[in-house]
Every structure is written in C-alpha cells, then in structure tokens.
Amino acid sequence: MEDTIRPLNYADIETSGPINLLETTNNLKSSLKKFSQKAKGSHISRERIHHFRKWKNKTESLSENHLKPPPDVDSLCFSNCFQPDALSGNVFLPPRSSNMYWNEKQLQLEMEILKFLSLNTSNECCTSDD
C-alpha cells in the first residue's frame, strides 16, 4: 500500500476525524516524494516527446480534414472549363489518390462528373442559363 496517497487531513480511510498538523505535514511530504519518484521514473526523452507531438499534430490535422464537408456539387465548375484548351473539348483532370477524397460517395460522384466531361465535348457544364 505504499503507492497509495492518503488524504492530507486523515490518517487513513477508516479514520473519521482529522489528525494533527505534524501528521498532515508528514503526509504531504510523503505524497510529494511519491509524486516526485513517479515523475522521475516515467521520464520521457525529448526525442520521444518531439515524435509524439509530430504524430499528434499529424493525426489532428487528418481528423480536421475528415470533418470538412464535401463541396456543393451544384456550385462546382472546373478550372479547365475557363482555359483556352478546354474550348477544343479536351478536358483533362489528373487522377487523384483515393486518400484525397472525403469518402467513397464523393469519389464516385467525381468519377461520374469526369465521365460526363469526357463525353460532353462542348463543355456545357460551365455554361448555365440561370
């Protein structure tokens, strides 16, 4: 029971009343000593702390990216539609790796859009009559 830290004003859990000031002080010193020993025993090198922080920052940024909602499909207009090469009907969007997508649904949607663009040589996707 040497790892147990007792309340400062009581000798043990079963005791119903406070103890004197000297015992309280001794309990406090004992508790601080135990905390100090545990802190020294669990010392982590600076290198491990650095790697942990890098890992934590990386995982936090990944989780933030997953929280972003996908863009509104109706408001999308590809930049290729405004380029001179796009007028000839040659629309080329480089393939992306699957980890750049929010989810499988968004990947499928973009693949359908790419199919539509490759079939539609007049680029009607960017000219709306609204």
Swiss-Prot record:
GO BP, sorted A to Z: negative regulation of formin-nucleated actin cable assembly; protein localization to mating projection tip
The organism's place on the tree of life at top rank: Eukaryota
One annotated Gene Ontology cellular component of this protein: prospore membrane
Name listed for the protein in its UniProt record: Uncharacterized protein YGL015C
